[in-house]
């Protein structure tokens, strides 16, 4: 099936698909491996997320923010981090064994924005909070949050990227950490790939010590007639139209970023321009499961979650 098939089902039918999948899931709850998601919070009431994200593993930088997902992004990240290719799992009948659990720290406020000079401190304190609560876990830290407004544009460090470098190195606490961060996104697709080449990886993904994830794509359209013979912007196996790069940086001074690329989806193009398309995105979990179970995710967020 195509991604849009699952997204367009009514909630009752989506719930049946999810219910069938849950019967095949085994979560090894004694695992010490966790993925800590720094984002908008996660709504772990979703039937696919509740077995792998306990209430006690949901944190927030500011108590008054709550731990819930006010935006949807954190829950979309969780579906991919928890299950990988969710669509493939739905389409087959194989047992699913999960050897990791999730943790969530809400680092973005429900209203307004954090002060830019606090980005590094918020990230550092949020990671420390989780490590203090569950010090025994083997933890991967995942953050698909970047700032285009406060990007140096040429690879130079910022206070935020420096904080990631310090955290990853274990300079303060002598505990090295795997921190995975998204490269940041491009939304001017008409001039692909020229725009991607001149669009800098965003702050704080210029961090030397973090693993920066960009996006490529294998996504193509099976039935172009459905879209009046439109085409995809990127070729199969090419750089995703969403991905920033470090081509314009001085590679004698600064790192080459992103470090790796994973599936981030493609974009549809016709005579009128470019547009996002569900079939060229990745299926994941929706943050309001009483309305529907599935949503789609794309760009370097999807790639980072992979």
Question: What are the residue ranges of the model-derived segments?
Answer:
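Extracellular S/T/G-rich loop segment that most often corresponds to the catalytic His/Ser-adjacent loop
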Residues: 39-50, 200-305
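A Trp-anchored, charged/polar loop motif used as the substrate-binding/catalytic surface
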Residues: 18-20, 117-132, 233-248
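Subtilisin-like serine protease catalytic core
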Residues: 24-57, 64-118, 152, 174-176, ...
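Generic recognition of flexible, low-complexity loop/linker segments
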Residues: 22-25, 66, 91, 129, ...
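Substrate-binding/access-modulating region of protease and related hydrolase catalytic domains
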Residues: 108-209, 217-220, 291-298, 302-303
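Autoinhibitory propeptides
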Residues: 1-26
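Gly/Ser-rich catalytic serine loop of serine hydrolases
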Residues: 62-76, 156, 293-306
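Basic/polar, acidic-poor N-terminal "presequence/leader" segments
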Residues: 1-10, 179, 214-215, 223-224
